[in-house]
From Swiss-Prot:
Its main location: nucleus. This is FK506-binding protein 4. Residues 264-287 have a biased composition (Basic and acidic residues). PPIase that acts as a histone chaperone. Histone proline isomerase that increases the rate of cis-trans isomerization at prolines on the histone H3 N-terminal tail. Proline isomerization influences H3 methylation thereby regulating gene expression. One of its GO terms (molecular function) is peptidyl-prolyl cis-trans isomerase activity. Inhibited by both FK506 and rapamycin.
Amino acid sequence: MSDMLPLAMYALNVEPYTHTPAVLLDTPVTVRITMAAIDPEPFDEDKKPSTLRIIRRNPVYLDAGEVDEEKLIEELEGDEAAEDGDEASDDDKEEEDEDEDVDEDDEDDDEDDDGEDEYEECVVVTLSPETRCQQAIDITIAPEEDVQFLVTGSYTISLTGNYVKHPFDEPLEDLYSDEDSEEYSDDELDQEIEEDDELDHDEASSEESDEDQEFYDAISEGDEDIDEQLAKLEETSDVEAHLEDLIAKDNKKKRKQEQLDEQPETKKSKKTKDEKNTKATENEKKNKAQVLEGGVIIEDRKIGEGPKAKKGSKVGMRYIGKLKNGKVFDKNTSGKPFYFKLHRGEVIKGWDIGVTGMAIGGERRIVIPAPYAYGKQTLPGIPANSELTFDVKLVSLK
């Protein structure tokens, strides 16, 4: 374990009877958990000790998208046997049909066995405020592992540790193929550098010539005015004295004109810039989507006013619940609002996370992944493993 380099702190709260993923599936880093501690505030009045369980997907289990080579070979052989059977007698066909039925039953039994072995569940630790409040552990979870935690009991268990760099993690430079890089000889590189230098020099020369021409034109205009007045003077001393006066007056006039030109533009541009920044900030706060714990996504449509909802707050909500295909499965848009207390286990986990931080009058869209909604449960109008979208409005807060 000494070879693993800590990168950042890891922390996760596992509330009772809520399947909580150990890490997000798109987090390409190893996690090392070293401490489990209990929250002394109970979720219910039973005050039962909390047991932390780890649920791990079996790595050898075949995903739905993977191909079982043995089954594929059996299917191909079955097709060949069917073709040969066209030439066989009727009695042979009946025997083959019976064999195929038996094979199908065996395959169904194998699939049932595989489903039972898909997940492994183990007990990690049991904690209680009266006997043991915390326990040092040492669990390392690789990025490719599908791991969830589940607490049974009356108390939340907090897990802490570190995101670590594992010696077997793939370095970033290995993600890029050597075939993508072009090989150049020293002569080709020198030639390209010389060509780039020539292009840069030509562009710079062109820019300098344009700037010099503008500068010279401005000087020439000023010199013409001075020359006209100097032509009227005959003595050298008068010319020198008058020249200094003309130059000073001309410079003063230019500075004054520049100040007059810059002042209105500065005030106007500053005012316009402030208005744009204010509008941009408001729009950003209003429409920017945020990804919270467990992949719950919130997007504020309207910012409310007053105190914000927090843990233990009693909130009254209006809402419309939709499936991913847009079908409405539940709503509360009139009559008595829907009341509940935040983070007391009265609603699905995604609602506790998504409603926290809202103020009265606020409107928000909450997108909840299946594990933080109803998971594998099938409810009226809600299929198993459904992602749910709620458009909610906070109408009361206590």
